[in-house]
A protein has these predicted regions:
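Exported/periplasmic ABC-transporter solute-binding proteins
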Residues: 1-172
Length: 172
């Protein structure tokens, strides 16, 4: 389960239609996309496909459904967030880099994003308390990790909403 970024792009843009074309078995490729506008799809197309759109293919509303279809369909390929990866599906190594938490934190694995929270001016009152609650170590290390997310405090790089990368955690 190794691909180059060029092969990944060729598969998801519909130029490669059989796994044999990228060194695999003689098996048709079945693309499964998340729906248009899904944050997972937007992230994948921006950072996995370098801004290209996926070919027209079956679309699913949830990552759980995507995982189930990929796990039960020979030749299927898709994308989900870490929280949905389990033994039923095999993550793909791209350009020799595995999609691990460490590789995301170090920005070696490029297909990642995190949510940004914005307020109208400096937060006050309940808004300020809620933001502090989300950033406390207990929530970052337990709840977020339990849900399959990497704590923003563990990130060694941050990405702005415009896609610019800089060294440092995403906590401001």
């Amino acid at each position: 389960h190794r691909l180059t970024s060029k092969q990944l792009i060729a598969i998801f843009t519909g130029k490669v239609k059989n796994w044999r074309q990228v060194g695999g078995k003689n098996l048709p490729i079945t693309l499964i996309n998340r729906t248009q506008g899904s944050g997972t799809r937007v992230t994948f197309e921006e950072y996995g496909l370098n801004g290209r759109e996926s070919a027209v293919a079956q679309e699913q509303d949830s990552s759980g459904t995507v995982r189930q279809i990929v796990s039960s369909t020979p030749g299927a390929i898709s994308y989900v967030s870490f929280g949905y990866v389990n033994k039923a599906v095999q993550p793909i190594t791209i350009n020799g880099i595995k999609p691990t938490e460490r590789n995301v934190m170090d920005n070696d694995w490029k297909i990642w994003s995190y949510e940004h929270i914005y307020t109208n001016g400096q937060p006050t009152g309940l808004t300020k308390k809620f933001l502090h609650y989300l950033q406390n170590d207990h929530i970052q290390k337990t709840l977020f990790n339990k849900l399959g997310y990497i704590s923003v405090k563990d990130m060694r790089y941050q990405r702005t909403w415009q896609g610019k990368i800089s060294k440092g955690s995403g906590v401001e």
